[in-house]
Amino acid sequence: MKCQKRLSYLFRKFALIKNFKGSANMSGKRIIISRTDGIGDVILALPMAGVLKKIYPDCKVIFLGRNYTKPIIETCANIDEFFAWDEIEKLDERESIKNLANLNADIILHVFPRRAVAELAKKAGIPFRVGTSSRAFHWSTCNRLIRLSRRKSTHHEAQLNLKILVSLGGKKKYTLNEIPEYFGFTKVKPLADPIRNLLDEKRFNLLVHPLSKGSAREWGIENFQELLKILPKDKFKIFISGTEEEGIMVRPLLVDKYPEVIDMSGKLSLDELISFISHMDGVLAASTGPLHIAAALGRYALGLYAPMRPIHPGRWAPIGKKAEYLVKDKYCSKCKKKNRCECIESITPAEVKGQILKMLP
């Protein structure tokens, strides 16, 4: 046991030694932010680009992500280039190395730890490769290690991402109130007239995103049904969003039953969804991509959350000037091994209605 503790101590000490000492000058450098997961995850990594641009205005920020998140990344004014991981992983090793090396990057930040990306970055000869010391494969693939553990952290995901920039001149902690200024989520494409014409200038246009494709605990269709029933129709125009598959599930219960509701599920590309949300007065959803899109755009975003760690709002709440969330103030882990969550379902439609009504002019 003593030997294990000693090895653990040396392991951590070495991690700190390998960490940056002082602020590295990245002015004029090409910096890759690697985050190859979902929409919400990518959005919460965008402030990293904003911070880098503030510290080093002439640096070039390249985002390594997946093709399906490309519209998110291209909406960010602080990102200069997008590079698709999907295309790289299709190639053989030699071509993959060549393609990554051709970016002429000076540094790569492994925000979402992925062994294949880390190994490729080393083989491509990227000079500075930054990863967290908590991932064993980073010890052999990175030459700069950051002491950062997300599992038990009390910080928000966006704050944890920004901690990776401390050794590049970033602050040790950014408050949730100051992070929105770094999103740069402003390059929104124009909304097509047929879609724009669906909006009501006299009512509150509310986008409801009831499902999550299993990525989050859900409020429940029954709760959404009751909410649609009690929201005043003279004050709200309701839109439903989701994939086509989700639309098949919710139409009989939320659209056919309430003919005044406009069904947008399966009808919008991600580019169009971003534009559409930018014209919404508010978005209601669980911890999903559309919720984080709304928050980053500065629209009213109301998230419905489970209190269980690590999916609680302390880690994944929407961040924005008009972002809010509802969660039961209790500790519970009953849904740890199942998708249905009693806590989030116990948030009443009346509570949600009351919160939304506060946003009316």
Positions of predicted regions on the chain:
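Positively charged, low-complexity intrinsically disordered leader regions
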Residues: 1-27
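Active-site and donor-binding regions of nucleotide-sugar-utilizing enzymes
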Residues: 29-153, 272-275, 282
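A structural signal for isolated positions on well-ordered beta-strands in alpha/beta enzyme cores
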Residues: 32, 60-62, 130, 207, ...
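Generic beta-sheet signal
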Residues: 85, 111, 132, 241, ...
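Donor-binding and catalytic core of enzymes assembling or modifying cell-surface/extracellular glycoconjugates
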Residues: 94-96, 221-306
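Nucleotide-sugar donor-binding patch of glycosyltransferase catalytic domains
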Residues: 131-139, 143-147, 263-264, 295-360
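Mid-sequence helix-capping/hinge segment at a functional interface
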Residues: 133-217
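Active-site donor-nucleotide binding/catalytic segment of nucleotide-sugar enzymes
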Residues: 186-249, 307-309, 313
